[in-house]
Amino acid sequence: MKKIIYTFFAFLLFAACTKENNTTKLEPVVSLTVNNLAADTIIGITPGVPPLGGMPYGAGKYTFYSIEKGAVVPSSDSATTKWDIAFRGTAILTNSGNGGPGAGGGFVYVGLFEDLKTVPSDSTFRTENVPTSYAIPFGSNKGWYVYDGLKNLVTPIPGRVLVIRTASGKIAKIEILNYYKGGVTPAATASDNVKMKDQRYYTFRYSYQPNGTKSF
């Protein structure tokens, strides 16, 4: 009888240990604010005067960023899955489709950043088909920003959240806060030289779900 009892308790102890070992420890949601991320900064002005000339131009290169690592990725790794999102001027690229070898994608969610607790079940993640289409629509008032030609300023649209699927298939939400150096939009009365010099520096915040779910 004692042998049976001992065997029973040994079984319970083994089962408890097995259950504990099989329990997956969930990682917390990562929240981060990124300041002054240079996105193909201005390197010159085209000859002439607007609209045919006098326009800023960059080197035409993307800045690659890993949402999962929280760090800029060297351009030499642009053909890998080490990056999740890339910036060039106002264009934003995901590691998907013909934009990269990853399982990424994205779409623009209309609503407040704080209110997006779970990605809606009917959401469609778009992938890159550059230059025909972008996962995050490119152009004034088409995606995350509006361009005021009279003031020559780019301003994030309130209530626009970028929902990003990373290169590994995880989910993040991003809010672009500012497009200018130091996170400060130049005054409308500032010179075009100042506006051009200080643009293409992103300030944004994001939350990243490392556990593979769609909830934050």
Each predicted region: which residue ranges?
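Surface-exposed, beta-sheet-biased, low-hydrophobicity segments with strongly acidic/polar composition
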Residues: 18-216
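C-terminal motif of bacterial Sec signal peptides marking the signal peptidase cleavage site
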Residues: 13-16
